[in-house]
Amino acid sequence: MEFADLLNHRACVRAYRYEPIAPEQIKAILAAGIRAPNACNYQSWHFYAVTDREKIKSAHGAVAHIPWAADVPLIIVVCIREEILNGLCEGFGADRGRAFAEHDAAGAINHMLLRAADLGLGGCWIGPMNIEMCKKHFGIAEDHIPTAILTIGTPASPPRLRDRRPLAEAVTFVGEPVDLG
């Protein structure tokens, strides 16, 4: 699929049919995550790739409100490494350091979701969760801070694209404008 087509046809998936994902596809998705741009090449992320069916099925309620994820074959818990976060905060100040680490994670998440879509899979980015319950449920290291959960799998039906605001409403030019019509 051409990149522009991928961008225009990717959508969040919240209904899956259980089909295992090939190991090489899982590796390709995770590899896309580590290729994301990041602050000063600190690579502040760490990913937990969860394929254990029981852990996935029991994640609803224990981690986040995701009842629709019971049939997903892969959950990726995206974490920020505390040691790197602390270094970013020391070097750039607390607010900027945290923002850099969160932006790093967001870039990795976006890369992984796009790669999953490129492989014909669907995915969803799940935000805030109970961090302590997430760490306990998935066995996450004490010095890793969960920041998002991705569900990845085969869509139960073609994903529904949602409307977007017109480009002209989402952009303000500073300088010579470009016709966005």
Regions found by a protein language model. Name each.
Residues H9, R35-A36:
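Helix-loop element at the rim of GNAT/NAT acetyltransferase active sites that forms part
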Residues I26-I34:
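A structural motif
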Residues P67-I75, G139-L161:
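A glycine-rich helix N-cap at a beta->alpha junction
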Residues N38-A108:
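Glycine/small-residue-rich phosphate/adenosyl-binding loop
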Residues F3-V13, Q25, A148-G181:
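C-terminal helix-cap and adjacent tail motif
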Residues E19-E24:
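A short beta-loop-alpha structural element at the N-terminal edge
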Residues G33-I34, I76, A94-H137:
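Small-aliphatic-rich amphipathic alpha-helix that forms the alpha element of a beta-alpha
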Residues I80, P128, T154:
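Short secondary-structure boundary segments
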